[in-house]
Amino acid sequence: MASNAARVVATAKDFDKVGLGIIGYYLQLYAVELILSEEDRSQEMTALATELLDTIEAFKKEIGGESEAEDSDKSLHVMNTLIHDQEKAKIYMLNFTMSLYNEKLKQLKDGPWDVMLKRSLWCCIDLFSCILHLWKENISETSTNSLQKRIKYCKIYLSKLAKGEIGSSDEKTLDYADFADDSEEIKDEDVDHQTSDLENNNNDKVEGLAPKDQTTSYEPVDEVPEFIDDADSVNEEEQTVDKNEDAITKDEQQVVKKEVDLTRPSAPSEPAAAEHKSYTKDELTKIMDRASKIEQIQKLAKYAISALNYEDLPTAKDELTKALDLLNSI
């Protein structure tokens, strides 16, 4: 779980760097909930969650304040809308993630089969998992199954890439036709329908932010892009997921080690979109406030012990009094 959260944080920072702060915003929210759902989280991860909450609040205030200015850019108004309108935010995240996923399917066929392809597939896994977690109450069962299926496909592709089964001149290359499913429509009809309804029923459309690719910003995507599904020989492929877990784990460790040095990666677990409890903003604040107070109490106790070592009784008494006051406030 810790390695998953660390990877999500690294991905969020990448999106911030390329001007897609709203994607990073929701990935950070997802990372906080991943960390808080871990009962045995380390102090480092607790501190990371606190830092993320501060970053999230600062981003909301910055966007909210700038969007209210008379000469503010239209994109700021859009981002402010995406922060406060969860239905529009869900559609935007779905639209972006499916665009990225579809682009990576084409790259799996044509190449290059480089480290960025692997990183992008992990990015798709994190984005799909984020959507399932943050909006699980507002996503149909059909869409949920569809997104979970694509997470499995991404893991299968990562395993094949790690073992050299895709893009290697000495091994069997990917036959793109193997993953075309004639039984399904090319487009994801459920999400396409949601997007159309949203645009028809709201005068203030969500536009101007959906990128054509991961590195460009503020280009509109009018509809969910064409989606090439991958379901021929699904049973055979899905049975290989568990067998290929070691190869996937090794690949993830290489990616996380390059991106962030927060914790040692462990074998990735299945995205827990429906397993984690969702917290309200007030609940998150209370949890982090309690953790912060406990950490402060520990520091004050250390100061008191240090003062006692030097027989500085007044300072020791003062520090212990502060610690006791904080303890009583919990």
UniProtKB/Swiss-Prot annotation:
Changing residue 302 to A: Abolishes interaction with VSP4. The modification Phosphothreonine is found at residue 195. The modification Phosphoserine is found at residues 183, 233. Keywords: Cytoplasm, Endosome, Lipid transport, Membrane, Phosphoprotein, Protein transport, Transport. InterPro entries: Vta1-like, Vta1/CALS_N, Vta1/CALS_N_sf, Vta1_C. GO terms for cellular component: endosome; ESCRT IV complex; multivesicular body. It is a peripheral membrane protein. Residues 290-330 are annotated as: Interaction with VSP4. Belongs to the VTA1 family. Present with 4400 molecules/cell in log phase SD medium. This is Vacuolar protein sorting-associated protein VTA1. It comes from Saccharomyces cerevisiae (strain ATCC 204508 / S288c). The gene is VTA1.
